């Protein structure tokens, strides 16, 4: 193996559920010396700490007697192309240690190449899905742009409708004004006649009032004269009293007649005001009715326009919904493809992780089997050594019994250790059998999972066939749509050519119409200028009429004031007359107080005369104002008649010109609307044709790309399924072969263990029989020794008795060989 001092150690800590792929360069075949060196190094080499998803139960390996504990000694597994060293982890840190040079295989390289291919294919599918998502986003953006365009169009339509309503309102106002002017012109003649009649009535009433006022003034003058005479004459006669009473009665009559004339004048003025108010109310009512009729017509027209716009909006919404449905189907297909891809990826990763785990577990089982083989070989060597030692012991037993006793005790201890080790081995074998059963159950679970995966693969294949059928149906629908669009294109091209011919013909007929229209515009401008002049004249006349009306209202107010003052004067006069009557009736006897009363009456008469003079002046001013107003009204009536005649003539001309202009405008509007509609229809159809062509090209490209992607995905899926099947079958075969090998090895180890147990039992029996023989021999030798000692003692006693105690006996005892042969105490 290579020198690993140059490369530093690499420690990787990963979660338990994440699979780890380790790529390591392949090493040359290791030599025996290098393997021994690497075995001695242990944890000092370049190692990788990999936390596996499945924790392996780490046990302390069995150590033969006479060696130290191998808790931190690594296990080694060698193969001609590979080498693997594993240091069992401590109980505190369950971390498996692997060498970087022990996991490099050609299968891993091929698997990683396949994984890279799968990743590339997945990236291509992700790119395709991203393209589809971007296209869906583009379609969403186009839909949002279309919605915004529709909203802008709606706002423009609302603005246009508002402008149309304003223009229509202005037109209605202008029409109402023109109609009012016409009605005023029609009603002026009747009003003139009615005014003349009212003027005559008012003049007659005013003359009557003036006459009554003059008569009252004469009566007042007569009263003044009589009062003056009474002043000069201190005594009143019966004639004077009669004249006073007559004059008073005449005054009362004149005042009553004046009151009646004033009442009639007030009634006439009230009737006139009521008539004017009723006429105004009728005019306002007619105008309101006309406005209501026009508003109803405009409302109906706007409702029709709104219905048309609602229909267009509904059609556009239906198109948008169709596009949304298509986008939803596309997004659902993309989501299903993504989910299928993710599911397949997850399954592939899970299966690869399970395969890697199974490979690691199989390698661990092989290592444990190799360890068991090494331990069995060590046990066999130990048994051979024990046999050799037994032979040696047999040879040495003959030489020294005491040494055999000590060795027998040692051998008994060693036999006890062997019994303990055999019990441990039995436990280890039972654990190995339990692990084998667990591996068999796991293998059965893997087989079941494989069956489930095969069922899922069948379901996925069915789903792929369904998707292919759906794609074929979509392609057929797209072909049908494309054929229908091509037919529409042909129709629209034919209609476009017809519209072009009609447009050229209309353009040819449009030039003379433009000349006529320019002439009509000039005439309309002239008429508008004349109409503006007439409108200015009419406004001036209206202002003058309003001024005269205001002046008439002021005069009527002044007349009402005069009436009120006259009433007040009449009331005061009545009160004074009644007081005078009472005074005359009560104070006829008291003639002494007449001068005071006369003075008071003279003062009151002077005040009344002053008031009458003021009223006369006011009457004169009012008559002058009324005469001025009459002259102004007559002059304005003449002007109004002239203006009416001119206006009627201008109206006739305006009507004729407006009829001509309306006809020309209608024709122009019809032609312009037709041209605009034709141009819009042509532009829309060209845009629709262009968009349809672009959509056809895009959809054909999308269909082609999707078909290619589906074919490639289906082929890749089939290849992957076949490869996974082949890999699973090969792995199953390898696992079955390994399991069979392990079972054969277990059976061999079991037979070897049975043989070892039998040999051990035989050895124990032989050893015990030999021990019994040795014990028997020892007892025999002891008995012979005792008998010999007894015999020697007998001889001693006999020699002592025969020869007596002397030096001869002592020397004889020291030199006797039997004494030397006896074992030391």
UniProtKB/Swiss-Prot annotation:
Belongs to the ODF2 family. Seems to be a major component of sperm tail outer dense fibers (ODF). ODFs are filamentous structures located on the outside of the axoneme in the midpiece and principal piece of the mammalian sperm tail and may help to maintain the passive elastic structures and elastic recoil of the sperm tail. May have a modulating influence on sperm motility. Functions as a general scaffold protein that is specifically localized at the distal/subdistal appendages of mother centrioles. Component of the centrosome matrix required for the localization of PLK1 and NIN to the centrosomes. The keyword Coiled coil applies. Tyrosine phosphorylated. Phosphorylated on Ser-90 by TSSK4. The modification Phosphoserine is found at residues 68-69, 90, 101, 104, 110, 124, 134, 256, 627. Its main location: cytoplasm. The keyword NAD does not apply. The modification Phosphothreonine is found at residues 87, 105, 226. This is Outer dense fiber protein 2. GO terms for cellular component: centriolar subdistal appendage; centriole; centrosome; ciliary transition fiber; cilium; cytoplasm; microtubule; outer dense fiber. GO terms for biological process: centriole-centriole cohesion; cilium organization; protein localization; regulation of cilium assembly; spermatid development. There is a cross-link at residue 133 (Glycyl lysine isopeptide (Lys-Gly) (interchain with G-Cter in SUMO2)). Signal peptide: none annotated. Self-associates. Associates with microtubules and forms a fibrillar structure partially linked to the microtubule network. Interacts through its C-terminus with PLK1. Interacts with ODF1. Interacts with MARK4; the interaction is required for localization of ODF2 to centrioles. Interacts with TSSK4. Interacts with AKNA. Interacts with QRICH2. Interacts with CFAP58. Interacts with BBOF1. Interacts with CCDC38. Interacts with CCDC42. Keywords: Cell projection, Cilium, Coiled coil, Cytoplasm, Cytoskeleton, Developmental protein, Differentiation, Flagellum, Isopeptide bond, Microtubule, Phosphoprotein, Spermatogenesis, Ubl conjugation. It comes from Rattus norvegicus (Rat). Testis-specific. Expressed in the proximal compartment of the elongated spermatid tail; later expression progresses to the distal spermatid tail compartment located in the lumen of the seminiferous epithelium. In spermatids (stages II-III) expression of the tails peaks and remains strong during the remaining steps of spermiogenesis (at protein level). Expression correlates with the onset of spermatogenesis and is first detected at 30 days. Higher expression is seen in testis of 40-day-old and adults that are older than 50 days. No expression is seen in 10- and 20-day-old testes. Residues 532-696 are annotated as: Interaction with BBOF1. It is found in: Cytoplasm, Cytoskeleton, Microtubule organizing center, Centrosome; Cell projection, Cilium; Cytoplasm, Cytoskeleton, Microtubule organizing center, Centrosome, Centriole; Cytoplasm, Cytoskeleton, Spindle pole. Residues 139-212, 240-418, 456-793 form a coiled coil. Residues 27-46 are annotated as: Disordered.
């Amino acid at each position: 193996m290579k020198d690993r001092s140059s490369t530093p150690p690499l420690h990787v800590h990963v979660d338990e559920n994440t699979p780890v792929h380790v790529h390591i360069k392949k090493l040359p075949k290791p030599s025996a010396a290098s393997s021994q060196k690497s075995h001695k190094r242990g944890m000092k080499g370049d190692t990788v700490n990999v936390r596996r998803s499945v924790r392996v139960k780490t046990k302390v390996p069995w150590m033969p007697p006479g060696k130290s504990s191998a808790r931190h000694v690594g296990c080694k597994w060698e193969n001609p192309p590979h080498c693997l060293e594993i240091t069992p982890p401590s109980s505190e840190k369950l971390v498996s240690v692997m060498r970087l040079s022990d996991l490099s295989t050609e299968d891993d390289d091929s698997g990683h190449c396949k994984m890279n291919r799968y990743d590339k294919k997945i990236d291509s599918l992700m790119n395709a899905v991203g393209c589809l998502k971007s296209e869906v986003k583009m379609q969403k953006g186009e839909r949002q742009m279309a919605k915004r365009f529709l909203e802008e169009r709606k706002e423009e339509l609302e603005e246009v409708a508002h402008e149309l309503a304003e223009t229509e309102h202005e037109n209605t106002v202008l029409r109402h004004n023109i109609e009012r002017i016409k009605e005023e012109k029609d009603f002026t003649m009747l009003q003139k006649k009615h005014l003349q009649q009212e003027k005559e009535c008012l003049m007659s009433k005013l003359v009557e009032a003036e006459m009554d006022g003059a008569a009252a003034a004469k009566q007042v003058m007569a009263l003044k004269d009589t009062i003056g005479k009474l002043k000069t004459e201190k005594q009143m006669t019966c004639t004077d009293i009669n004249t006073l009473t007559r004059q008073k009665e005449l005054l009362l009559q004149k005042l009553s007649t004046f009151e009646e004339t004033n009442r009639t004048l007030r009634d006439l003025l009230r009737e006139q005001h009521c008539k004017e108010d009723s006429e105004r109310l009728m005019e306002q009512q007619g105008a309101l009715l006309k406005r209501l009729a026009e508003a109803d017509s405009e409302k109906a027209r706007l409702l029709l326009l709104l219905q048309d716009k609602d229909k267009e909006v509904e059609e556009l919404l239906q198109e948008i919904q169709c596009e949304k449905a298509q986008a939803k189907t596309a997004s659902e297909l993309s989501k299903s493809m993504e989910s299928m891809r993710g599911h397949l990826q997850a399954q592939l990763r899970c299966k690869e992780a399970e395969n890697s785990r199974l490979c690691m577990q199989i390698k661990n089982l092989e290592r444990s089997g190799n360890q068991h083989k090494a331990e069995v070989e060590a046990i066999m060597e130990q048994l051979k050594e024990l046999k050799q030692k037994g032979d040696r012991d047999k040879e040495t037993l003959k030489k020294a019994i005491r040494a055999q006793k000590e060795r027998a005790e040692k051998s008994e201890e060693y036999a006890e250790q062997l019994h303990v080790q055999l019990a441990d081995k039995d436990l280890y074998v039972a654990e190995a059998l339990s692990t084998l059963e667990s591996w068999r159950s796991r293998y059965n679970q893997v087989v079941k999972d494989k069956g489930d995966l095969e069922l899922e693969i069948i379901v996925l294949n069915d789903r792929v066939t369904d998707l292919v059928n759906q794609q074929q149906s979509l392609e057929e629908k797209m072909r049908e749509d494309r054929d229908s669009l091509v037919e529409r294109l042909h129709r629209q091209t034919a209609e476009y050519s017809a519209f072009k011919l009609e447009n050229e013909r209309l353009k040819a007929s449009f030039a003379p119409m433009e000349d006529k229209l320019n002439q009509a515009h000039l005439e309309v401008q002239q008429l508008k200028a004349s109409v503006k002049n007439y409108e200015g004249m009419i406004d001036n006349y209206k202002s003058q009429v309003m001024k005269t009306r205001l002046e008439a209202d002021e005069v009527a107010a002044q007349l009402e004031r005069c009436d009120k003052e006259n009433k007040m004067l009449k009331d005061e006069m009545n009160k004074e007359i009644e007081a005078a009557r009472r005074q005359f009736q009560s104070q006829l006897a008291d003639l002494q107080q007449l001068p005071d009363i006369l003075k008071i009456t003279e003062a009151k008469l002077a005040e009344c005369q002053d008031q009458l003079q003021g009223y006369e002046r006011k009457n004169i001013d009012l008559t002058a104002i009324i005469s001025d107003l009459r002259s102004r009204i007559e002059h304005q009536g003449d002007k109004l008649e002239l203006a009416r005649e001119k206006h009627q003539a201008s109206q006739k001309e305006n009507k004729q010109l407006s009829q001509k202009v309306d006809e020309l405008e209608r024709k122009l509007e019809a032609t312009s609307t037709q041209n605009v509609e034709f141009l819009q229809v042509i532009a829309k159809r060209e845009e629709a044709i262009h968009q349809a062509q672009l959509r056809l090209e895009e959809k054909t490209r999308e269909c082609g790309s999707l078909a290619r992607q589906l074919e490639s995905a289906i082929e890749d899926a089939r290849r992957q399924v076949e490869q996974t099947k082949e890999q699973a079958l090969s792995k199953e075969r390898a696992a079955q072969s390994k399991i069979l090998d392990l079972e054969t090895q277990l059976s061999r180890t079991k037979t070897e263990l049975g043989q070892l147990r039998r040999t051990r039992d035989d050895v124990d029996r032989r050893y015990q029989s030999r021990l019994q023989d040795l014990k028997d021999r020892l007892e025999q030798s002891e008995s012979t020794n005792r008998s010999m000692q007894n015999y020697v003692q007998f001889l001693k006693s006999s020699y002592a008795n025969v020869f007596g105690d002397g030096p001869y006996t002592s020397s004889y005892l020291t030199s006797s060989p039997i004494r030397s042969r006896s074992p030391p105490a």
